[in-house]
Structure formats: structure tokens, C-alpha cells
Regions:
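AMP-binding/adenylate-forming catalytic core of the ANL superfamily
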Residues: 116-141, 156, 301, 308, ...
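Conserved AMP-binding/adenylate-forming core of the ANL superfamily
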Residues: 45, 49-104, 121-126, 186-196, ...
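Conserved AMP-binding/adenylation subdomain of ANL enzymes
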Residues: 236-255, 265-306, 321
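Conserved pre-ATP/AMP-binding loop-to-beta segment of ANL
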Residues: 45-47, 170-171, 182-217, 224, ...
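Gly/Ser/Thr-rich phosphate-binding loop
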Residues: 189, 276-277, 305-310, 319-385, ...
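Conserved structural elements of the adenylate-forming
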Residues: 71-72, 196, 228-249, 394
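Conserved ATP/PPi-binding loop(s) of AMP-dependent carboxylate-activating enzymes
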Residues: 392-396, 407-441, 480, 576
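Structural core segment of the AMP-binding/adenylate-forming
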Residues: 108-193, 311
Length: 598
């Protein structure tokens, strides 16, 4: 890890574990560690970023030298607009090379990056940019999605009418004539014109190690989104070097591919993991199953991906196209696969392990969160694999599983996931909201970080995440996680996805409600509902007989494909579903509301 000035103290907890400071006195920058370190080495001329559009004929490759030159030009252009240290800069961009250029350009000048999901509508953009008081936004006219231009600039324009802090908008022309792009004089700047003539070589800002680098929002169960603050030393010290290198064996020779969005944590992983180690990154615009259902596997094949990341929901969706689709492609370049974002059910885990890992490749399950900037549990090359399990605790974080009083629970018992030690990746409070930070993580069990996940360790020492702890279902005094029942439902082969929630019951305390997405070709009728209900009874016992089985075409999901059980539960109970800005498919909420209104 590179510093301009070495730190004088590794860890300072004099104000309490909640306010731990790392690498005190040290100065550094994410760009120093991810790009500048490779100058003058053989890595500098090697490919860093490989991009493919929805049309596979649209491809672009940038070496580290070429990529860094673009970063410097954009960084200099931003400085020419008066943007500098501590200013917040929004990124409202899809999966393009320029998105990653922007990521590093903002950090290079010491500004604070605010990634925004490229599928956001105006309201979530307004909420985030206003909370962070953004000075500038980097955006694009639009992006291709399933062969159709998706307009982004006009969405941003609508939002900025209610964001007075934004003084500058830098606009990339990607769609060209396919998208009209009105420009506001004095505020909007054409990207290409702005960077033309700028220097391709400029110094990187020397920042305090714990200075804010990234302001990334995550949804709360209630209220506005929570602004998590990553520092220049934090994300690299946790997710990149500790989790993905020491635990998950990322190497300089690897080509990384994890199809997501810069608006989520995986976007920063894609930017920083390969660049820190001198590896390469594959970026793909669009969706994994267009222009054909084998696109995702073809990308792995054509670009010789060695390190593949997936979300369980992605695999559930690709499974529907049949085994023969994935088997058409040569995936022999793969060395390691990893997954994150949500709990696995057994059927898709086994499908992926058989058809992609060929029952021999490491399949490393990782889980953490935006708030911790890294992993709480991880897979490694040295621990056994079991469907949906994690081999080890995150290093050094004091990960434990406890009961309501904070006492550790035994093997086979379900408890609350907590972290007892300060973690270099922890959010540096929540953006300008210390009280909410303490309430959210530290006051349930004083002096212990309560993460909000429901976890278990089995008799062999493997760990499992069983859903959010606010998803916990307690039926007749028995506590269970939703994924246990969801595994039974998807195991019937009749449904591709399921969300299980607990709802109040006068006798049992909670009753089970199952919301399921039938597989293509399976009739969504009363017979299916009865079959699914019986599957739960057979697997869990009669006390878990569902009160209701609802059949829908889709479940509410975030962009990184987490199923939002809290939203399903709130809609079912007639409560406000809270912040929905991270949903990729709000129409799923409307469908569920419609079915419940009948």
C-alpha cells in the first residue's frame, strides 16, 4: 500500500470504537495506489479496461497508460471548472469506459465521488445530490438497453431543477443522433470539448488517509437513504487488499468481470480491484441476456475472463434459458468465481457449480455491505464449499453471531451478525448524521457493530447468512430465516424466485406468506399454490404452513439484484415501503399491490 507520508499510528480508538481512526498522520490517494503505482513498470502498457457495447462489434481497449491519460485530462478539466478538494461530484453514468475514467478523475483531484445508479429516476437523484450538496455531476446523453436508447440527461435535468448546489454538468455524447440532448448554457459542458487540449499528465492530490473519498448511499429500512463515507485508505484496506487478495486470491494476471452498475458497491470493486493489482477489467453495457440469451457466457468466453463475479438472482434468471445455453460456450479461461449481494438457495448454487465451475473451480461466496466497505464473511481457497455457505470470517473484524443479549450462540443456532473490532472499511459515520450512525449500528448492543444480518454457523464451522435480521420470522416461538423456506420453494423446480415474509398472527406470533415467480411455462394457478404450500409443510413442518402463496411475474429488486423482502412485507401489511429509490423494477411493487387489492 502506497503513502506519500507514512502514518505515525495505525489505529486510534481514543474516542471509542465507533470513531476509530486509521493510518493517523499518513497521506495517500486511491489513485496513487490504483494507477500511479504502475507508472514505469511493464503494467503501464498492458490492457486495463476492455469494453463491449450491446452490439458485440462495438469494442474498445485501453492500456493503463491510455486510461491514465484520459483520467488526467478529465481531472484537469474538472479543476478548470473550479472543482477541487472536498467538493462532491455525482456520477450518473452507465457501464462505459468513461465511467471508470470519471471515477478516478474525481478522486485524483481530491474531490468526493458520489456514484448514482444509472437507472435512477429524478427523486432518488434529488435526495442524494441534495444530501451531499453536490457541486457537479458527470453524466451521459443516454445508454443502450435491450436495443433501445435509454435517455439519462433529461432525467438528470428534471432532478437538477430541485438541486440548487449543482453548478456544473459534464455531458458525454454516447448515443449521438439517437438521443436529443438539450444543454443548459453556463451549467452544461460537452465532455469531449472540455477535455480537449487538457494535459495528459498531472499530479495526484495528496490526501489525509482518512479523508472522505466516496459518498455511497444505501437504503435504510425507514427514512432517507444513508450516506456511507469511504476514506482513501478504507476501501482499499478492506475490500481490495484484505478480502479480494488475501482471502479470495485475486492476482495481477486476472481479468475481472462482475456485471453491475457504478451506483453500487460492485462498481467501486470493478474500478479498484484489478487496477490495484495490475490486472484487467471487462465492462459490458446493457443487460446479460440481450441481444441473445447467451450474451453473458459469450462475454466470458470471448474476453477470456479469469475472475467472474455473479449475484444469485442473475444466475436464477439465466438458469431459465436451460443448461444447453451455458454449455454452448467455452468457459475454460475461468480460474475463480465469486458471488455476493444476497443469500443463495441450493438449486441455483448447484447449477452454477456444475455448469460454470464444472465442479472443480473455486466458488467463493462473499458478503459484507456498503457500510463496512468489505466482507463480513468470505470464501477462501482453503475452506470447503457447501451450497450458500461462507468458509471464514472477514479478517480482523471480530465477526460473531450473538443472541439478543449479545452472547455468542452455538453451532446450528441462529443469531445476529455483529462485529466486535474496529474495521478499516467502516463508514466514517453517516454523511453529516452522527446520531443516525450510532442508532443504526452501535446502540443496539453498546460497543458492538450490529450489522442487521441473520447468521448461523454449522457443526463444521461454515457460516450462513439467512437474510436481514429485520426479515426474521418467528412462528410459534421458532425463529427461522426466509432463505430456508425459499430454498424449499425454488427446489420444487416450479418457481424461479421466492420471497418469504412473516406477518403478524394472533396465535403463532408470525405467519408465513410466500411470494413466488413461476418458471416459464408453469401455470400460475391454484394447483401451483397448493403444491408450493405443501412443499413448505413437508420441509418445515405443519406449523410453517403458509397463510398465503402469491404468484407474481417479478419481485422487487435493487440494481445489484437483491430481493427486497422488506418492501414485499410492507406492501403486504399496507405499510409505507420506505425508500424505493434503489429498486430497478418499481412495477413489481405495483403488481403486488394490485394483487393484494383484489
Amino acid at each position: 500500500f502506497r503513502f506519500y507520508q507514512p502514518y505515525t499510528q495505525m489505529l486510534d480508538t481514543s474516542r471509542g470504537i465507533e470513531w476509530a481512526q486509521w493510518c493517523v498522520g499518513g497521506t495517500t490517494n486511491i489513485v496513487l495506489n490504483c494507477l500511479d503505482r504502475h507508472r514505469g513498470t511493464p503494467v503501464w502498457e498492458q490492457p486495463f479496461l476492455v469494453w463491449e457495447g450491446e452490439d458485440p462489434k462495438n469494442r474498445k481497449t485501453l492500456s493503463y497508460r491510455e486510461f491514465d491519460a484520459e483520467v488526467c485530462r478529465l481531472a484537469a478539466a474538472l479543476q478548470s471548472l473550479g472543482i477541487g478538494r472536498g467538493d462532491r461530484v455525482g456520477l450518473y453514468l452507465p457501464n462505459l469506459p468513461e465511467t471508470f475514467v470519471a471515477f478516478f478523475a474525481v478522486l485524483k483531484i481530491g474531490a468526493v465521488l458520489m456514484p448514482l445508479f444509472s437507472g435512477f429516476g429524478p427523486q432518488p437523484i434529488i435526495a442524494r445530490l441534495n444530501d451531499g450538496e453536490a457541486k457537479a455531476v458527470l453524466t451521459v446523453d443516454g445508454t443502450w438497453r435491450r436495443g433501445t436508447p435509454g435517455i439519462m440527461k433529461s432525467v438528470l435535468d428534471e432532478a437538477l431543477a430541485e438541486v440548487p448546489s449543482v453548478q456544473h454538468v459534464v455531458v458525454l455524447r454516447h448515443l449521438g443522433e439517437a438521443s436529443p440532448c438539450p444543454m443548459t448554457p453556463g451549467r452544461d459542458h460537452d465532455w469531449a470539448s472540455l477535455v480537449a487540449g487538457q494535459t495528459h499528465d498531472m499530479p495526484t492530490a495528496e490526501m489525509a488517509a482518512d479523508a472522505p473519498a466516496v459518498l455511497l448511499y444505501t437504503s435504510g429500512t425507514t427514512g432517507k437513504p444513508k450516506g456511507c463515507v469511504w476514506t482513501h485508505v478504507g476501501f482499499l484496506g478492506s475490500m481490495v487488499t484484505r478480502d479480494m487478495h488475501i482471502c479470495a486470491d485475486f492476482k495481477p494476471s486476472d481479468r475481472f468481470f462482475f456485471m453491475s452498475d457504478m451506483g453500487w458497491m460492485v462498481g467501486a470493486m470493478c474500478a479498484c480491484i484489478p487496477s490495484y493489482f495490475g490486472g484487467s477489467l471487462l465492462v459490458a453495457e446493457g443487460t446479460p441476456d440481450f441481444p441473445d440469451t447467451g450474451r453473458f457466457w459469450r462475454l466470458v468466453q470471448d474476453h477470456k475472463v479469469t475472475y467472474l463475479g455473479v449475484a444469485p438472482t442473475l444466475i436464477r434468471s439465466l438458469m431459465r434459458y436451460g443448461d444447453e445455453e451455458v454449455e454452448r460456450y467455452d468457459l475454460s479461461s475461468l480460474r475463480i468465481t465469486c458471488s455476493g449481494g444476497e443469500a443463495w438457495t441450493e438449486a441455483p448454487w448447484r447449477w452454477f457449480f456444475k455448469h460454470v465451475c464444472k465442479e472443480r473451480l473455486p466458488f467463493l461466496n462473499i458478503v459484507g455491505g456498503t457500510e463496512v466497505g468489505g466482507c463480513n464473511f468470505t470464501g477462501t481457497l482453503h475452506h470447503p464449499l457447501r451450497p450458500g455457505s461462507f468458509g471464514a470470517r472477514g479478517l480482523g473484524a471480530g465477526v460473531d453471531i450473538v443472541d439478543d443479549s449479545g452472547q455468542p450462540v452455538g453451532a446450528g443456532q441462529v443469531g445476529e451478525l455483529v462485529l466486535r473490532n474496529p474495521n478499516i472499511g467502516f463508514t466514517k459515520s453517516l454523511w453529516r448524521d452522527d446520531e443516525r450512525y450510532l442508532d443504526s449500528y452501535w446502540r443496539t448492543l453498546p460497543g458492538v457493530w450490529v450489522h442487521g444480518d441473520f447468521a448461523m454457523r454449522d457443526a463444521d464451522g461454515l457460516f450462513y447468512i439467512l437474510g436481514r435480521s429485520d426479515d426474521t420470522i418467528k412462528v410459534s416461538g421458532k425463529r427461522t430465516g426466509p432463505s430456508e423456506i425459499e430454498t424449499l420453494l425454488t427446489g420444487t423446480g416450479k418457481v424461479s424466485e421466492a420471497a418469504v415474509i412473516g406477518v403478524p398472527d394472533e396465535i403463532k406470533g408470525s405467519a408465513i406468506v410466500c411470494v413466488c415467480v413461476p418458471m416459464p411455462g408453469v401455470a400460475a394457478d391454484a394447483a401451483l399454490q397448493a403444491e408450493l404450500s405443501q412443499a413448505v409443510v413437508h420441509g418445515m413442518g405443519t406449523s410453517y404452513r403458509p397463510r398465503q402463496v402469491l404468484l407474481v411475474s417479478d419481485l422487487p429488486k435493487t440494481r445489484n439484484m437483491k430481493i427486497m423482502r422488506r418492501v414485499v412485507r410492507a406492501v403486504y401489511r399496507g405499510d409505507s415501503p420506505g425508500d424505493l429509490s434503489s429498486l430497478v423494477n418499481p412495477e413489481a411493487v405495483a403488481e403486488l399491490q394490485g394483487k393484494l387489492a383484489r
